[in-house]
Amino acid sequence: MRFHSFLIKYGEIGIKGKNRYLFEDALVRQIRFALKDVDGEFNVHKAQGRVYVDCEGEYDYEETVESLKRVFGIVGICPVVRLQDNGFEQLKKDVEKYIGEVYPEKNQTFKIEARRSRKSYPLNSMELNCELGGVILDAYPEMKVDVHNPQIRLNVEVREEIYLYSEIIPGPGGMPVGTNGSAMLLLSGGIDSPVAGYMIAKRGVALEATYF
């Protein structure tokens, strides 16, 4: 299964009120900087309160994920399969294929979590949950629905395109570097000063280091 995009989840940035866009813009800049030396072409952008990394053409998946895992401000990284909207019948086939390729065991519990941002889509979120859940049960009878603690949580987001994702890779959290001023870090040669530097950088402080 080829993942075409990454959905970036953030934490504290989401409670910043009217200044939220400043923190989102800083996160986008930091992601672009982290990916500048990674093989591949990437389009990092915001859309409807989300941050996405769209992968144009071939790219190094492992290197991309490792680079994103080092960006402060990212709470989770979701590899996304991005689909053209070719009708609901095609979506059912795509969901069946996604489960078949990503989860070869086909005996786990699952839950569908649909989100319909494009209100013109003919089915609402609850109808998508029910219909797509039925598709998986028909295709893979050993799988069971568990709405409370599923092993697989398949997210289906209906936008101009359709996004499928089920994995959340943990990020470092914190705030994007540069959103909370700057400071000088004295590196004395012990372990405590780099640890302190990491922790303060995680709070969004841009650091300059000095040695003696």
Residue ranges, per PLM feature:
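RNA-binding accessory domains that recognize and position tRNA/RNA substrates
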Residues: 1-184, 194-212
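Conserved G/P- and acidic residue-centered "switch" motifs that form tight phosphate/ATP-binding loops
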Residues: 190
